[in-house]
Design a protein with these regions (language model features):
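Conserved phosphate-donor/acceptor-positioning beta-strand/loop module used by diverse small-molecule
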Residues: 93-112
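Small-molecule kinase domains that catalyze NTP-dependent phosphoryl transfer to phosphate-bearing small molecules
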Residues: 115-160
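ATP-binding Walker
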Residues: 13
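P-loop (Walker A) phosphate-binding loop of NTP-binding proteins
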Residues: 10
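Walker A/P-loop
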Residues: 16
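Glycine-rich phosphate-binding loop used to anchor ATP phosphates in small-molecule kinases
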Residues: 52-94
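Conserved substrate/cofactor phosphate-moiety recognition/catalytic segment
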Residues: 19-67
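Hydrophobic anchor at the beta1->P-loop junction of P-loop NTPases
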Residues: 7
Length: 160
């Protein structure tokens, strides 16, 4: 049976680390859909309503559903732009949908970002410009905060 796991949060919060760990743990039959890969790398799209990454993300998730994959959808996925697509996926996957949100402080996200190889790709000033406080969908099953480690987030997700 297909399952959808949505991992959202601001830049530098730990989403990519968690989804990579989940994909490594579950292995074959896991489809990782990373917003940065789809929107920025593959399509060179801007973050704006109607951008083509919305449809491609949904199409890839539907592919995963049709093939009974564990589908990991990871990214910022701002609610004002992506909520309708995420709602459609929630409807498609039904009760096999789990959504998580990284609700870190800006300072913690910057601290985390400084430990990554991507730290040269964008600055704390960029992160501040993109920052959205408490950008919840309203149907998350759990929220991760400054106190939660990668292992805490992994354990929370892998027990579901």
């Amino acid at each position: 049976m297909a399952k959808l796991v949505i991992i959202r949060g601001n830049s530098g919060s730990g989403k990519s680390s968690l989804t990579k760990k989940l994909q490594a743990h579950y292995g074959r039959g896991t489809l990782l859909i990373a917003q940065d890969t789809i929107r920025r790398d593959m399509l060179k799209e801007k973050v704006e309503p109607g951008n083509l990454s919305i449809d491609l993300t949904e199409s890839l998730a539907c592919f995963g559903y049709e093939h009974d994959f564990l589908v990991l959808v990871e990214g910022f996925y701002e609610t004002d732009i992506y909520c309708h697509m995420l709602e459609r996926l929630r409807t498609l996957f039904g009760p096999q949908t789990l959504a998580y949100y990284y609700d870190l402080t800006f300072e913690e996200a910057v601290r985390h970002h400084q430990t990554r190889s991507k730290k040269v790709d964008f600055s704390p000033a960029d992160m501040k410009r993109w920052w959205k406080e408490c950008d919840f969908l309203g149907w998350e099953v759990a929220t991760f905060t400054d106190q939660d480690s990668l292992e805490d987030a992994f354990q929370e997700n892998s027990k579901k």
